[in-house]
Amino acid sequence: MTTTLTRPADGDGSVQVHQDPGTKIEEGALVIAVYGKGGIGKSTTSSNLSAAFSKLGKRVLQIGCDPKHDSTFTLTHKMVPTVIDILEEVDFHSEELRPEDFMFTGYNGVKCVESGGPPAGTGCGGYVTGQTVKLLKEHHLLEDTDVVIFDVLGDVVCGGFAAPLQHANYCLIVTANDFDSIFAMNRIVQAIQAKAKNYKVRLGGVVANRSAETDQIDKFNERTGLRTMAHFKDVDAIRRSRLKKCTIFEMDDKDDGVKAVQDEYIRLASNMLNNVEPLEAVSLKDREIFDLLGFD
């Protein structure tokens, strides 16, 4: 077992899943955890960002941390089996596995892993993430990696699904220019504040997605100390790329808006590689968000 429950932990009086030292990712790789409200486009953002890093010559590994295991299919062009599914087939004897059993090569050489998750209502997502990282380390698959991206389930910030924050250098929060998305973002900021007490993770910034404007995001950023790292408008080619099971970099750049989206992803990847300054954002109380955003 790779994770333990201890008290006290990150939050005051809370019980959290803590990282087993044996699952620690070695220094050197840039590790990014991508969070955001459910359905906001985290997997699309993560996959396109992975592709952008690969375009910059980096060796990239993307780890999907969602029981739906659909994080990487635009990179691999198919749904791949999860780590948990594969481990169950060998009765959790990981020594019987080969890397090609659970890691798949996607667009432009991006390595793809889907951790999967426990059955609904059982188990812990943090344990699954820990098992995945442990398996990757056992097979020495993290040693030749420049960038690791964790694409994390929805806006669930319990101790389990906050586990990828224990491995990450930075967290990127994907949001839209609406109240519900920003409300979820505030909760994620709170989780990062808790994890940053004991782990190296820091806020990298915000990715504004599927939003023509960013006025509400800007208002929240100014109040909390966040910043927008990239802005993707509601370009139909992004939706169509998902339907075609491919990244935005595989779409015709002559299509309306495609080149601008590609350039924005490259810009985001470049900025993340340049030792982006971590943010010391301060979350708001729920009532403060209601007062800040609309509701005049």
Curated annotation (Swiss-Prot):
Pathway: Porphyrin-containing compound metabolism; chlorophyll biosynthesis (light-independent). It catalyses: chlorophyllide a + oxidized 2[4Fe-4S]-[ferredoxin] + 2 ADP + 2 phosphate = protochlorophyllide a + reduced 2[4Fe-4S]-[ferredoxin] + 2 ATP + 2 H2O. Binds 1 [4Fe-4S] cluster per dimer. GO terms for biological process: light-independent chlorophyll biosynthetic process; photosynthesis, dark reaction. Its cofactor is [4Fe-4S] cluster. Keywords: 4Fe-4S, ATP-binding, Chlorophyll biosynthesis, Iron, Iron-sulfur, Magnesium, Metal-binding, Nucleotide-binding, Oxidoreductase, Photosynthesis. The keyword Metal-binding applies. It is an enzyme of class 1 (oxidoreductase). Mg(2+) binds at residue 43. Transmembrane segments: none annotated. GO terms for molecular function: 4 iron, 4 sulfur cluster binding; ATP binding; metal ion binding; oxidoreductase activity, acting on iron-sulfur proteins as donors; oxidoreductase activity, acting on the CH-CH group of donors, iron-sulfur protein as acceptor. The keyword Hydrolase does not apply. It comes from the Bacteria. [4Fe-4S] cluster binds at residues 124, 158. Its EC number is 1.3.7.7. ATP binds at residues 39-44, 68, 209-210. Residues 1-21 are annotated as: Disordered. Belongs to the NifH/BchL/ChlL family. Homodimer. Protochlorophyllide reductase is composed of three subunits; ChlL, ChlN and ChlB. PANTHER family: LIGHT-INDEPENDENT PROTOCHLOROPHYLLIDE REDUCTASE IRON-SULFUR ATP-BINDING PROTEIN (PTHR42864:SF2). Component of the dark-operative protochlorophyllide reductase (DPOR) that uses Mg-ATP and reduced ferredoxin to reduce ring D of protochlorophyllide (Pchlide) to form chlorophyllide a (Chlide). This reaction is light-independent. The L component serves as a unique electron donor to the NB-component of the complex, and binds Mg-ATP. This is Light-independent protochlorophyllide reductase iron-sulfur ATP-binding protein. It comes from Synechococcus sp. (strain CC9311).
